[in-house]
UniProtKB/Swiss-Prot annotation:
Listed GO biological process terms: translation
Entry coiled-coil feature ranges: none
Gene that encodes it: rpsF
Record-given protein name: Small ribosomal subunit protein bS6
N-terminal signal peptide: none
Organism expressing this protein natively: Leptospira borgpetersenii serovar Hardjo-bovis (strain JB197)
Length: 91
């Protein structure tokens, strides 16, 4: 298992629904979340999918690389997730 940081930007209009969808996706692929930070609502530098603001959420987690690939694909399909970024941590 490797350690990752995962950041998502979600639609303001579906804050709670999207948060539970993200948690369900992580659980579905056996991603172990070690830390969970809500960075709150922020103005976006430029509109993403016609949205001017987004909810930023940051996770520290550990998982197999294949599970992270599947999570990223699920996030691309989800219309409520505007952007996501996964970074592998050293060690």
């Amino acid at each position: 298992m490797r350690n990752y940081e995962l950041t998502t930007i979600t639609r303001v209009s579906s804050r709670e629904v999207t948060k539970s969808e993200v948690q369900d996706t992580l659980n579905k692929f056996s991603v172990s979340v070690t830390a969970d930070e809500d960075w709150g609502q922020r103005k976006l530098w430029h509109p993403i999918k016609h949205e001017e603001q987004g909810i930023f959420h940051h996770y520290k987690c550990s998982a197999e690389p294949s599970a992270i690939e599947k999570v990223e694909k699920e996030f691309l399909i989800n219309q409520n997730i505007l952007r996501s970024m996964v970074v592998r941590l050293d060690g």
